[in-house]
């Protein structure tokens, strides 16, 4: 499976989850570069604080993290200019299947909601839906 994405970002405070997702994405060869962040604030600053860096194609963000949560990350992302948002597909990747969480995420246009674990099938469906 190849999608020719330049950059995928994983934002998750769980090191094991990030490691496994990084391995899966590497094995699938879907991106030239994969970056991982354990803190949402650091990820946001690195990705959108420096306007000289190209925006990532895809960002996976967990909802439940210490410090800035995935919901706060989505708020910051949603406040970016539409032209900036249009360059990146945002996907929540979480263990939560609570209806309150899915409803909160649903208020953000164009944000995908996936439950953990990330699998080859889920990745394939996301790529087909958003990048083909």
Locations of the language-model features?
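Helix N-cap/capping motif at the beta->alpha junctions
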Residues: 36-49, 70
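Alpha4 helix (beta4-alpha4-beta5 surface) of REC/receiver domains from two-component response regulators
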Residues: 72, 85-87, 91, 96-114
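Conserved acidic segment of CheY-like receiver
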Residues: 6-16, 21-25
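C-terminal output helix
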Residues: 118-127
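Short amphipathic alpha-helix used as the core "switch/output" element in two-component signaling
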Residues: 45, 71-84
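Active-site beta3 strand of CheY-like receiver
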Residues: 52-60
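Conserved sequence signature across two-component system core domains
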Residues: 11-12, 37, 59
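Receiver (REC) domain active-site loop signature in two-component systems and cognate sites
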Residues: 65
């Amino acid at each position: 499976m190849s999608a020719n994405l330049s950059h995928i970002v994983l934002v998750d405070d769980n090191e094991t989850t990030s490691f496994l997702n990084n391995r899966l994405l590497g094995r699938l060869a879907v991106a030239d570069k994969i970056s991982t962040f354990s803190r949402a604030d650091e990820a946001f600053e690195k990705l959108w604080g420096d306007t000289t860096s190209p925006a990532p194609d895809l960002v996976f963000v967990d909802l439940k993290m210490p410090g800035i949560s995935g919901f706060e990350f989505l708020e910051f992302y949603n406040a970016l200019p539409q032209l900036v948002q249009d360059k990146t597909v945002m996907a929540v990747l979480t263990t939560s299947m609570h209806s309150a969480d899915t409803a909160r995420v649903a208020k953000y246009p164009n944000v995908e909601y996936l439950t953990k674990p990330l699998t080859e099938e889920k990745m394939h469906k996301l790529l087909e839906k958003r990048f083909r």
